[in-house]
Design a protein with these regions (language model features):
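Charge-rich alpha-helical segments
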Residues: 1-103
Length: 103
C-alpha cells in the first residue's frame, strides 16, 4: 500500500481499520457528530489545514451539529493510500476535539 497512485482493493480498505468510515461508491465517507456549530467549524478548519499540507482535498459539509467528509482520489477514480492517510488524520483531529464518527 505504498504507491500513492494505486487504487486500493476492498480487502486493503477493510485492513486499514478506519472506525466510522464507510465505503460509498468509489469514496470513503464519514459523519462526525460535533453537537455544536463552533466545534464543527474548528474541525473543518483543522481538516482544511491538513488537506492543504497533504495537497489532497476532501469534500466537506458543515451543518449545525455535524461535519460530513468524503474522500476519493479523482485521478484514479477510487480510493488510494492518500485517502486512508487523510482519513486517519481527520479522525485524529476529531478525537482531539472529543468528537466521534457515526458508526
Amino acid at each position: 500500500m505504498t504507491d500513492p497512485q494505486r487504487k486500493l482493493s476492498a480487502a486493503e480498505l477493510t485492513e486499514a481499520g478506519l472506525t466510522g468510515w464507510h465505503l460509498t461508491g468509489e469514496a470513503l465517507t464519514a459523519t462526525f457528530k460535533t453537537r455544536k456549530f463552533s466545534t464543527g467549524l474548528e474541525l473543518v478548519n483543522r481538516i482544511g489545514a491538513s488537506a492543504e499540507e497533504a495537497n489532497h482535498h476532501p469534500d466537506l459539509t458543515l451543518t449545525y451539529r455535524e461535519v460530513g467528509v468524503t474522500l476519493t482520489s479523482h485521478d484514479v477514480s477510487g480510493i488510494t493510500i492518500r485517502d486512508i492517510d487523510l482519513a486517519r488524520t481527520i479522525s485524529g483531529h476529531a478525537a482531539d476535539l472529543g468528537v466521534a464518527a457515526e458508526e
